[in-house]
Amino acid sequence: MISDFNNQEITLEDLEQNNVKLKEGKAKVQFLMRFSLVFSNIFTHIFLFLLIIVSGLFFGLRYTYYNYKIDLITNVYKIKPSIPKLKEIYKEVLEVVDEVKRETDKNSEDSLINKIDEIRGIVKEVTNIAKEFDEKSKEVKPKVEKVIQEGKQVTSNLDKITKEIQALQVNGNGLASRVRRSLTGDINTITNLANNIDFDFNSVKESIEKITGLAQQISKEGKSITKNVEEIKNEVEYFTGKSKEPLKDIDKIKQIYDKKIPIFEKNNKKLQEIWNKLMGIYNEFTVKETKKDYYNYVIYILLFLIIDSLILLVITYMSMISKTIKKLLLFYIFGLLSFNPIVWASIIISLFSRPIKNRKNKFY
């Protein structure tokens, strides 16, 4: 038997039982406090993550409000009716995209991308012919100019021949008249005819020689013209034959355009209709004028809760390492300010550990 601090006699067995009860109570206190701290720490992480997401959302809403005048909060009731419209627009966009994908599919022979390669080949062939024609035209051009020049010369010579023939006709008519008059006259007239006829014959002979010379020159120039014209003709026939296929291919290009352009015109018209529908939905959520501090109060509250949650995380980590009354009081204060129901529940649980009564134990 021994006496305690109150001079009451107790046995060693009573002391041992009392010591066991104290240890069990202390273990229970430590468990409740540790559980409340861990529990609040975990859900503060989750709550902080949600706060960051919501804050990002509100910052986005604030940005669209001030930059695009879109007010989703006031017009939130319009979101649900707009969803079916957006789904319909989405289907229409998919139809346009599918059609465009078909036209850009390299595995499809009828796709526009393959037709473009075909058009590129045709254009290259036509370009090569044009280049060849340009090179040949440089060779043909002097021949054409020569034909024109020789043609002018032939025309000039023909005019000269015409004049000589006219002169020959005049001389011949004059000679015939004198002969007729002389045959009906006397001997003196015949004598004069003999004297003049030599001159007339010389004039006729000279005209005939000129005509003969000009005719030979015309014949020579005609052969040259014929030769050059034949060469020009051959070149023209060469290019005429060579251009038949490219000309058919150009018709093929026209057919491709006639077939494919309506598709893109239709899609362009459809995209314009889709855009008009989207703008109609967009206009339903816009406001004429923005208010200065419309979203600020929400942003301030969210920032306060984020800062409070960060401080609460630091306090819970520190309290799990070393629990003191000061840390627990801070835990209670910032836990209440967190507006987190689960943290409030953790605070209530921690109160069962009677932290004020057990403050001397420091909850180790």
Swiss-Prot record:
Q: Keyword annotations for this protein?
A: Membrane, Transmembrane, Transmembrane helix
Membrane topology type:
Multi-pass membrane protein
> Where would one find the signal peptide in this protein?
none
Q: Where in the cell?
A: Membrane
Transmembrane stretches, by residue range?
41-61, 298-318, 329-349
- Which domain of life does the UniProt lineage start with? Bacteria
Main location group: membrane
Q: Which GO terms describe its cellular component?
A: membrane
Put simply, this protein is called: Uncharacterized protein MCAP_0005
Q: Which organism is it from?
A: Mycoplasma capricolum subsp. capricolum (strain California kid / ATCC 27343 / NCTC 10154)
